[in-house]
């Protein structure tokens, strides 16, 4: 079966944040309209409380590279709507939802999520079953591939990422838990998974991890600490780290990956803001964190913390605006970073608070809207149609969740 998709990565005065957001808001045209649209709407929300600081000297705009995963020319995308779609009317059958923002229902608890370039479909991982499902509105989810995983505890099929040359090779990279370790594998539809990087320690808990391509030859791999914070500080262990993997083909003796960041708790998500920073979310016994690795390697740790531990998960980063899925927090948290320092000094705004339950995966659609996957079957209070993939309406105002 052939599919295509896109990928889905010090305190300063508040004026720097506001100027940076205004710079982003002026960068919403061109072939990367989806990224600009996300930054536009999130940025507008976060700007609501900004004072009128001097707006001179904007940083140059570097557009995010995209994978050309479809040979067809995609239509120009309209700006995202802030108005929820009208509810469906008439009798509903099994696994049908009255909310038209719901894209797919009756999934097993989810792992990673990505969107396809048509803007109307995506791929979502089922964490416990190891299935990769193609989902679209008003369409029954279809299994694209399946990987043997150990879905006990918090392990299983944890995240997926598209090969940079997917249009030619149809390869999907995945971060998975097996009976002996956590590992990175790759798989094509209808094929079996091949190991790319193995030997990452696994545990009864703390197996959370994530994948994101920073460049065609660089796969960022976030690994959990297996419930043992000491291994996250151990340079000899691959657990509790952000790794840069350059060997992307199956190899009996792959080279050891570069350790970019140590001290990770239970991995949440990794997202790349091209040319600016790589962002990492993780969960510790004391707090949940958002950490930043600048393009020059400078680490801001943490860039933001949540002492109430809302369960940070997948993330999206666009021109200094970061969106983070929250599990126990039952929302998406949107944060704005100063474009020069990466500092976050303004409390996040909350999106879709208490609307769909616990959220885990997060992706960007080609129309600029966020897609999220729920994890209610294992972490929340599941309804009859859980778990789901939903398209989240963007905020028109601001609210706080800290």
Label the model's feature ranges.
Residues 242, 291, 296-305, 388-402:
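Predominantly five- to eight-bladed beta-propeller fold
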Residues 91-98, 233-235, 287-288, 296-302:
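Glycine-rich phosphate-binding "P-loop"
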Residues 1-54:
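Secretory targeting and sorting signals
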Residues 2, 32, 43, 51-227, ...:
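Acidic, Gly/Ser/Thr-rich repeat motifs that build Ca2+-stabilized beta-propeller blades
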Residues 271, 279-281, 285-327:
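Flexible, glycine-rich surface segments
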Residues 246-249, 295-296, 336-343:
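Short helix-loop-beta junction
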Residues 227-278:
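Loop-centered beta-sheet repeat module
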Residues 165-167, 249, 285:
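Acidic glycine-/aspartate-rich tracts in secreted/extracellular proteins
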